[in-house]
Design a protein with these regions (language model features):
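Short, small/polar residue-rich loop motifs at catalytic or cofactor-binding pockets
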Residues: 120
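Basic/polar, cationic surfaces and motifs that engage anionic cell-wall
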Residues: 2-13, 21-25, 29-91, 129-139, ...
Length: 253
């Protein structure tokens, strides 16, 4: 496999995906903007269920490409930056059933582009209730916020849901820890920089139930443990098979 550019995970093939060792969830990330329609959701679910049970080892995880979850193209512009710290957000919208996760990302992106006029969805990586990881905005560009802090230098992770109202599933914490561990090793960022949105601006984000895992040190410990075990190899999963994986998520598989 060719060495990826710094800050951009390598692309994983279907064969490599099936060979990844692991535990729960699958994941997401950056690709093209055209969405490929899967032909057989049930087949996709069968094909990926075995992989799901093996994906999330201490060293390997998948990122579902933008085309897989149906992202629009990013607009031109944005602020280039160098990532120096890590910040946790929640969606502040009840997710409920995880089948809603990809559609929420599409809704968030439309809102951010059409209502706020931003170049793209505000965050760099998203994590759903089942620990699937989605790449959102390019990590080369600073995120956006409707609050009063400067996002330059921040690696922004979005946990889907409203954690003032919803509990935080274990799988979602695992996915968030993996995303942050990947960022820490890729951008050489200390885990001591990890913060919640509310630490930087006047907001309840990332919600009381999720913030509890920050304030207690639980999330940082999870990230540190992953790094001590060798870090996280976050690999991009793109094309028809990735689109089929998203269709399976939306079908409840």
């Amino acid at each position: 496999m060719c060495e990826p550019a710094r800050g951009r995970p390598a692309v994983v093939s279907r064969r490599q995906m099936l060979g990844l060792a692991g535990g729960v969830g699958a994941a997401a990330v950056v690709g093209t903007h055209s969405r490929t329609a899967p032909t057989d959701v049930a087949a996709a679910a069968r094909a990926t269920s075995t992989a799901d049970a093996r994906l999330m080892s201490a060293s390997s995880a998948l990122l579902l490409c933008r085309d897989a979850w149906g992202a629009r193209p990013a607009r031109s512009g944005g602020r280039r930056h160098t990532i120096t710290r890590m910040t946790l957000h929640h969606e502040a919208v009840v997710l409920g059933d995880n089948r809603n996760a990809p559609s929420h990302l599409r809704q968030d992106q439309r809102y951010h582009q059409d209502e706020h006029g931003w170049i793209d969805i505000a965050y760099h990586v998203g994590v759903d209730r089942n620990g699937n990881i989605y790449e959102l905005r390019s990590t080369e560009l600073a995120g956006d916020t409707a609050t009063d802090y400067d996002t330059t230098g921040h690696f922004l992770v979005l946990c889907e849901g409203d954690f003032d109202q919803e509990s935080v599933p274990e799988a979602q914490l695992v996915g968030a820890a993996r995303a942050f561990a990947w960022a820490a090793q890729t951008f050489r960022v200390a885990t001591t920089t990890l913060a919640g949105h509310r630490d930087l601006a006047s907001t309840s984000c990332p919600g009381a139930n999720l913030y509890a895992h920050l304030s207690s040190g639980d999330l940082k410990r999870r990230i540190d443990d992953l790094l001590a075990a060798g870090g996280v190899d976050l690999q991009r999963f793109c094309g028809p098979d990735a689109a089929a994986r998203v269709a399976a998520i939306e079908a409840g598989n």
